[in-house]
Amino acid sequence: FTTSQIKGSSCIVEYFEPLASTGLGMFTITGLGHAYRFVGEAKAQDCEVDVNCVPEGTGQTAQRDGAVRISVKEGTLLGWCSGSLINNRAQDCKAYYLTAFHCGVNASTADFTAWKFYFKYQRSGCDSGAASTGSSVTGCVKRGDSNDGGGNTGSDFLLLEGEDAIPTSYNPYWYGWDANNTNPGSGVRCIHHPNGDEKKISTVNTIQSSSAWNGIQAQTHWRVTWAGTTNGWGVTEGGSSGSSIYNSSGLIVGTLTGGGSYCNSVQPNGQLQPDYYGKLSYHWESNGGPASDDLKNFLDPNNTGLKVMTGSYGPCGTLGMDDADGFEAPGVSPNPADGQVNITLPEGLKDASRIDVLDLSGRLVVSMRIGTDNTKL
């Protein structure tokens, strides 16, 4: 068990035991993290954008609900990282958290039991409203990693499984993902906790298909630059490490290793500098470590070979997808097909603006916007 931050220079620990066991109980405080100033007052840089700002956060509610702040412990060191709750093809509601390996490259099994995952740590408005630390779970075990020293020679991923189920009151969202090595193009975003602060959102300007974190492995990372938006110019900071970038369909395609972006008030022209995200396609099975550590073993446990997975608020529910009540699937004919197909949308999807067509391997075949007649394409 680990507490959240306690404000002040002293605290009282109370222990209650059954009357029949009076004086027999014992407990040990294994460690104490002390900050010389209240770390809750540490704030992100001034150009960052709150996740509930409009228009930046509009339509990003699910991805917001799947992003977590992580209190990390490595020996005597404490710090912040970001991460994402991620779905798997078994859709069994396992509490898998995807983050960066460098966040815990030296963490022991005992250290991981003290890691704390905060949901819903965000302002209710745009630069307004208080954030609560009350929605958290403690403890995890390591499942897989990039075996690269924290990005030295690979894509820098760490997959953890929470020791406890996530309370439904947290309204957790399990992110979907795309493990194809395809440039996600436009509409890419990142939700993160810079400097351990309330949840922020950053909007991608450009994304380079292949890059490297340290110049050794050229195919491991996406090189990203950020765009100015209505309410700021979202960048990344310490504490953002491990956060995901996701494509226009809301699917994770990479996790943050680091980079050179800053608000201009901190470093002139810092908002134009790039950051680097380890590719989920490289996490999949390309890092060269033990095959048992590959991400695909956990996200595709039944070895279907499919590389695209949708996100869900309840993956182990009856249908295992968002808003499943009364769901009607789009009509596709002929199916299978090797040429032209007709797609008919049910009433529940009449407001859809785009259609993505995937083949049986999960590869994106075509993506198109729906025309003026939005019931048939």
Please state what every model-predicted region is.
Residues 1-3, 376-377:
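Exposed aromatic-hydrophobic patches
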Residues 5-224, 238:
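Serine endopeptidase catalytic core focused on the charge-relay Asp
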Residues 84-92, 233-256:
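Catalytic nucleophile loop of clan PA
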